[in-house]
Amino acid sequence: MNNDKLQRMVENLSEEKFGRTFRHCAYFNKRLRTTGGRYLLKSHDIEINPKQYEHYGEDAVVKIILHELCHYHLHIAGKGYQHKDQDFKRLSQQVGAPRFCNSIESYQQRANYEYYCTKCHAKYIRIRKVDTNRMRCGHCNGKLRMKRQLK
């Protein structure tokens, strides 16, 4: 799927589900890592993570588009477009837009460091490096040591 097909898909879904036209751009952004898509407030564009399409197919992209279109149409209408707003919750439920998308990588796959407690030997896996002089074990307050670097 390319950006032109994505643009047409967004325009069609906007007409079908919301009864309103989508007048801005929708495109894939390969720099998105932890989110399925995002609605840009200043430009009103919608960005979609291409990895979602590669991993889960067109059905997942449709769900992400519906979610982002909820943000889009509510923001354009001047209503509450944030996840916490009742307008957003109501509209997303009406059109069947999910609150979350499937994650591409689990936390375990993204982890770079493995630590252990010197006292109780509890294991901690982290994406970012931890300052072992400041951080302590959450179970017994023991000292942490790096066991290995995973990547």
Swiss-Prot record:
Domain SprT-like: 6-147
Subcellular location(s) per record: Cytoplasm
Residues that, per the record, bind Zn(2+): 67, 71
Cofactor: Zn(2+)
GO biological process: response to stress
Cofactor note: Binds 1 zinc ion.
Catalytic residues in the record: 68
Transmembrane segments: none
One GO CC annotation: cytoplasm
Gene Ontology MF annotations: zinc ion binding
Principal place of residence: cytoplasm
Listed InterPro entries: SprT-like_domain, SprT_Zn_ribbon, Uncharacterised_SprT-like
Keywords: Cytoplasm, Metal-binding, Zinc
Matching Pfam families: SprT-like, Zn_ribbon_SprT
Family the entry assigns: Belongs to the SprT family.
Descriptive protein name: Protein SprT-like
Organism encoding this protein: Staphylococcus aureus (strain NCTC 8325 / PS 47)
